């Protein structure tokens, strides 16, 4: 019985690992596609913003206006595609956080313990620095009080 349960456990574990790998591959694909969309659309917006210095290309005013509205609409569509890709990246970030929270407790526990240790170390260093400054200020204050007392005493006697 225990051999069967162990086999089922290994099978479940490998299935979980395969599922995690598929999810991670999907995250990578989404990231790659959205970044590519942002880059391509930004490149095409910059390319469309270039002004054609050749006025001879337009025989009449209608040609200029047609190109202007075409370029304007193309830039608006590309800007909207960039917004959509950015929104998808935000969703991807939320999905990654959810995935990490649900599937990687060991990683989170390790990071929390590491952050706590770092915080305690920083607190200890700051406390030591505070104590050093406190003793230094106390010594300076004592020297000043002694100097004032000696000078004040010498003047009024």
From Swiss-Prot:
InterPro entries found in the cross-reference section: Med22
Superkingdom to which the source organism belongs: Eukaryota
GO CC term (a single one): mediator complex
GO biological process: regulation of transcription by RNA polymerase II
GO MF, any single term: transcription coregulator activity
Subcellular location as annotated: Nucleus
Sorted UniProt keywords: Activator, Nucleus, Transcription, Transcription regulation
Purpose of the protein: Component of the Mediator complex, a coactivator involved in the regulated transcription of nearly all RNA polymerase II-dependent genes. Mediator functions as a bridge to convey information from gene-specific regulatory proteins to the basal RNA polymerase II transcription machinery. Mediator is recruited to promoters by direct interactions with regulatory proteins and serves as a scaffold for the assembly of a functional preinitiation complex with RNA polymerase II and the general transcription factors.
Subunit structure: Component of the Mediator complex.
Similarity comment text for this entry: Belongs to the Mediator complex subunit 22 family.
The protein's name: Mediator of RNA polymerase II transcription subunit 22
Species this chain originates from: Caenorhabditis elegans
Lineage summary: Eukaryota, Metazoa, Ecdysozoa, Nematoda, Chromadorea
């Amino acid at each position: 019985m225990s051999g069967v349960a162990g086999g089922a456990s290994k099978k479940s574990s490998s299935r979980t690992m395969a599922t995690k790998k598929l999810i991670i591959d999907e995250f990578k694909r989404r990231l790659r596609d959205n970044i590519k969309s942002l880059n391509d659309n930004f490149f095409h917006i910059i390319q469309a913003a270039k002004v054609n210095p050749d006025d001879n290309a337009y025989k009449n005013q209608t040609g200029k206006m047609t190109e202007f509205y075409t370029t304007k609409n193309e830039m608006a569509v590309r800007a909207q595609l960039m917004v959509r890709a950015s929104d998808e990246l935000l969703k991807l970030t939320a999905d990654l956080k959810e995935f990490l929270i649900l599937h990687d407790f060991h990683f989170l526990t390790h990071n929390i313990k590491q952050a706590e240790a770092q915080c305690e170390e920083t607190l200890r260093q700051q406390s030591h620095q505070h104590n050093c400054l406190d003793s230094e200020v106390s010594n300076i204050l004592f020297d000043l009080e002694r100097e004032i007392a000696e000078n004040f005493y010498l003047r009024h006697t």
